[in-house]
């Protein structure tokens, strides 16, 4: 029914991702469709049932094989286009913020690249967990989108000083968690602005360059990076 194009898909076809499928393969890590057949011994799924899948490959074909354990049954009311773009970004943000970041209600989260897929999911998950969210994006339009989906404050790093704006928005304390799917030139000023015993979550490097972060900050601020 539908397949999404995620940043890992671009890396996979360039052989730059940690998962390197054997050639030849059909790209498309995440998709939604209807079960056409079941393997021997498969339980919990039925032929004709709608599912969303995240098997890593196959989504850009007319048919795909997927392990049953990686198929999520869908209600008929869930649009295929939404379902095909749901699992990866929300699972990524939930794992980063809740499992690795140990986010607690009342903490402040800074989301870099906040208007993208994982960024918008991070805003929603952090708000659902009771956090205050600062969304950083590259335009006023993107910042407005972030506010519409729940961000408490925004930072436009195309014309605002990252460290100064973060300091102003946190009364000089800094964010407890920084969620970074972007990397690049704004990673270091954000990293240097983190709160005492904060957590820096490295989710990806969508900007291209992998930043070299000052490790001394981890000792002086007792912060954790993941």
Locations of the language-model features?
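Glycine-rich beta-strand-centered segment in the early N-terminal region that forms part
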Residues: 1-4, 16-58
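NAD(P)H dinucleotide-binding glycine-rich loop of Rossmann-like/cofactor-binding domains
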Residues: 11, 20-24, 50-115, 148
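Conserved beta-strand positions in the Rossmann-like core of class I SAM-dependent methyltransferases
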Residues: 36, 134, 201
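Mid-domain Rossmann-like dinucleotide-binding core that forms the NAD(H)/NADP(H) cofactor-binding site
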Residues: 46, 84-160
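N-terminal Rossmann-like NAD(P) cofactor-binding module of classical short-chain dehydrogenase/reductase
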Residues: 52, 110, 155, 178-179
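Glycine-rich phosphate-binding loop and adjacent beta-alpha segment
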Residues: 137, 146, 182-221, 225
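Short amphipathic alpha-helix with an adjacent loop that forms part of the alpha/beta core around
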Residues: 161-172
């Amino acid at each position: 029914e539908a397949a999404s194009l995620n940043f890992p898909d671009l890396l996979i076809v360039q052989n730059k991702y940690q998962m390197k499928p054997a050639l030849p393969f059909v790209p498309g890590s995440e998709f939604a469709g209807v079960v056409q057949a079941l393997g021997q011994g498969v339980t919990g799924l039925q032929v004709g049932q709608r599912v969303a899948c995240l098997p890593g490959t196959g989504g850009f074909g007319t048919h795909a094989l997927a392990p049953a354990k990686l198929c999520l049954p869908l209600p008929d009311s869930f649009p295929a286009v939404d379902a095909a773009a749901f699992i990866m970004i929300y699972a990524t943000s939930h794992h980063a913020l809740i499992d690795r970041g140990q986010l607690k209600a009342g903490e402040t989260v800074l989301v870099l690249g906040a208007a993208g897929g994982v960024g918008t999911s991070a805003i929603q998950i952090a708000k659902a967990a009771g956090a205050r969210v600062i969304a950083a994006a590259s335009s006023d339009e993107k910042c407005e989108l972030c506010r519409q989906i729940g961000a408490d404050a925004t930072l436009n790093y195309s014309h605002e000083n990252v460290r100064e704006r973060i300091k102003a928005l946190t009364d000089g304390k800094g964010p407890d968690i920084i969620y970074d799917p972007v990397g690049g030139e704004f990673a270091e000023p954000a990293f240097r602005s983190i709160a005492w015993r904060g957590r820096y979550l490295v989710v990806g490097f969508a900007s291209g360059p992998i930043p070299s972060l000052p490790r001394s900050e981890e000792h002086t601020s007792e912060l954790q990076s993941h």
